[in-house]
Amino acid sequence: MCTYNGAKYIREQLDSIINQTYPIFEIIIQDDCSTDDTVEIIREYIESNKTIKLFVNEKQKGVTLNFITALQRASGDLIAISDQDDIWNLEKIEKQVSYLVQQNALLCFSLSKPFTLDSIPLNIDLRVPNYGLERLIFYPVIPGHAMLLERAVIDLLPKVFLHKRSYDGQIAITANAYGKVVVLNETLTAHRRHLNAVSYIKPESNERSINNIIRYLSSAFKGYKSNVKRRCDYMKDVHLYLQEFPQRSSSLQDALHLSGLLSDKSFMKMIKASCLCIKLRNKIFYAKENNGLVAVVRAALWPILCCKYYSK
């Protein structure tokens, strides 16, 4: 668990971890220079639970570096990642460990359902996402708080560390490149959403209506010129990252090919990228598009549409 000014909610999360039905070997908490009572609350818990190991950064590391360095401290064979403000189902770890071992996987993730006690809009989408490399190069669809992984995955992370990219995206890509990633299709995390959460973004309506489609396409095309450079920069980083893996599965080869094309904004590369996206249309979106014609059109436009991910 990594913390930063999490005093308001951390007790609920710690209680849900300590009371897991699966025995917890160690609880590593790394605080990123909190200015509230987070550290004091953790020290209270340490008095009655010696499995908790607290580390306080001398200087702020930021979310990604804080998580990566905290994960490197783990000494167990399996690691579960926790946010500071969620609430776990008490059988979360037991179920994930059982499924990961059964499937002989490097990483298992479960589903989570957002909740809030604040008056803020939520986007509740309980579809099982595409989580292959063809999707992960665009967006980290496997959130860290849902992951259980082999400790070995952390040692396999490429030396080309992407400081500006999400830690969970890097972990998911690495696990996919070296082995098997599986999803346990159960909702095991209550994922708290509040205005102070680092990852909270006000959701847009995703209802498939004519007005929403027009608004979505208009926004994507209008923002293309300002976002395409950021897409190219992002894909250059991803392409460099993927080249670090010695294995060359068909999924990795497709991800390498696509990230290479999308790192160049020339017209010919965009046409080639569109053709490849059409071929990979069942793998590149958040979830499989059931309407075949819509899938082809979305895929053909994907080199433009995906630029919205990288807007400021």
Where do the model's predicted regions map?
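Short, well-formed alpha-helical segments that are part of the catalytic scaffolds
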Residues: G6-N19
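Conserved nucleotide-sugar donor-binding catalytic segment
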Residues: Q72, P129-S209
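C-terminal subregions of glycosyltransferases and related glycan-biosynthesis enzymes
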Residues: K164-R165, Q170, A177, V181, ...
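Conserved donor NDP-sugar-binding/catalytic core segment of glycosyltransferases
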Residues: E91-L122
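A conserved acidic beta->alpha catalytic loop
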Residues: D31-E40, K59
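Short aromatic/hydrophobic "clamp" motif used to bind/position activated sugar donors
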Residues: I79
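Glycine-rich, basic loop-to-helix element that forms the pyrophosphate-binding segment
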Residues: N57-A74
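Short loop->beta transition adjacent to catalytic acidic/histidine clusters or analogous donor-positioning motifs
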Residues: I18-I29, D37, N49-K53
